[in-house]
Amino acid sequence: MEMESFMDDLLNFSVPEEEEDDDEHTQPPRNITRRKTGLRPTDSFGLFNTDDLGVVEEEDLEWISNKNAFPVIETFVGVLPSEHFPITSLLEREATEVKQLSPVSVLETSSHSSTTTTSNSSGGSNGSTAVATTTTTPTIMSCCVGFKAPAKARSKRRRTGRRDLRVLWTGNEQGGIQKKKTMTVAAAALIMGRKCQHCGAEKTPQWRAGPAGPKTLCNACGVRYKSGRLVPEYRPANSPTFTAELHSNSHRKIVEMRKQYQSGDGDGDRKDCG
């Protein structure tokens, strides 16, 4: 029976009961009100008491004033030289260089005006008067005009390298010209009809030296002259002055001809062969 009544009450969704439930929920619980009755009137406006706050602040801030509470961090910036910190020294150096090269710093350093004072003395009794003139030079123009690039000093020593090369070149050219001249002279002599002074030959593979000088004999006569067998009776076969009765190109025949002339058989018919 109790179970059935409980189920009926649970399934009853009438409005008056809901209102009663709402009233019960809206009423504050008794235990909460009892707890609040123990508080002072000042506690309803502030969360913390001012007297207790000072004690808490002193206790909480005690560790801030104590310097020994924190461990000391050892740094070597002031002890070691700047070589052990290349990054910081490099950054500082670059910063100083940029500051020196910046146009703002140049304008600041060169913004001062130069004052020149000229004194003009007069010969009268009034003495001398000084006139001060203030001239402000333009900063950018003074920086640009005042800068002068260092010029390299020219050496005063004589530069004979090119001259020597020119002399050698001209000497080589002159030597080549002389060789050409000698070759042209020999060619001109052949063209003009050089002849052997002994046999009168005009064509020969090589001109040789003779009693009159170099290149005065043909090849055959020059060989005979060098060996000491050049006689008036000797004539090459191709010589234009060759005569079979008086001349020969064989040394043995020339010796026989001379024996006949010495015996007296051909004294009347002998002619000068020289």
Swiss-Prot record:
<dbReference type="InterPro" id="IPR013088">
    <property type="entry name" value="Znf_NHR/GATA"/>
</dbReference>
<keyword id="KW-0863">Zinc-finger</keyword>
<feature type="short sequence motif" description="Nuclear localization signal">
    <location>
        <begin position="152"/>
        <end position="159"/>
    </location>
</feature>
<keyword id="KW-0238">DNA-binding</keyword>
<keyword id="KW-0862">Zinc</keyword>
<comment type="similarity">
    <text>Belongs to the type IV zinc-finger family. Class A subfamily.</text>
</comment>
<keyword id="KW-0479">Metal-binding</keyword>
<dbReference type="GO" id="GO:0003700">
    <property type="term" value="F:DNA-binding transcription factor activity"/>
</dbReference>
<keyword id="KW-0804">Transcription</keyword>
<keyword id="KW-0539">Nucleus</keyword>
<dbReference type="InterPro" id="IPR051140">
    <property type="entry name" value="GATA_TF"/>
</dbReference>
<dbReference type="GO" id="GO:0007623">
    <property type="term" value="P:circadian rhythm"/>
</dbReference>
<feature type="region of interest" description="Disordered">
    <location>
        <begin position="1"/>
        <end position="39"/>
    </location>
</feature>
<protein>
    <recommendedName>
        <fullName>GATA transcription factor 1</fullName>
    </recommendedName>
</protein>
<dbReference type="GO" id="GO:0008270">
    <property type="term" value="F:zinc ion binding"/>
</dbReference>
<comment type="function">
    <text>Transcriptional activator that specifically binds 5'-GATA-3' or 5'-GAT-3' motifs within gene promoters. May be involved in the regulation of some light-responsive genes.</text>
</comment>
<dbReference type="GO" id="GO:0000976">
    <property type="term" value="F:transcription cis-regulatory region binding"/>
</dbReference>
<dbReference type="GO" id="GO:0005634">
    <property type="term" value="C:nucleus"/>
</dbReference>
<dbReference type="InterPro" id="IPR000679">
    <property type="entry name" value="Znf_GATA"/>
</dbReference>
<dbReference type="Pfam" id="PF00320">
    <property type="entry name" value="GATA"/>
</dbReference>
<feature type="region of interest" description="Disordered">
    <location>
        <begin position="102"/>
        <end position="132"/>
    </location>
</feature>
<feature type="zinc finger region" description="GATA-type">
    <location>
        <begin position="190"/>
        <end position="244"/>
    </location>
</feature>
<keyword id="KW-0805">Transcription regulation</keyword>
<keyword id="KW-0010">Activator</keyword>
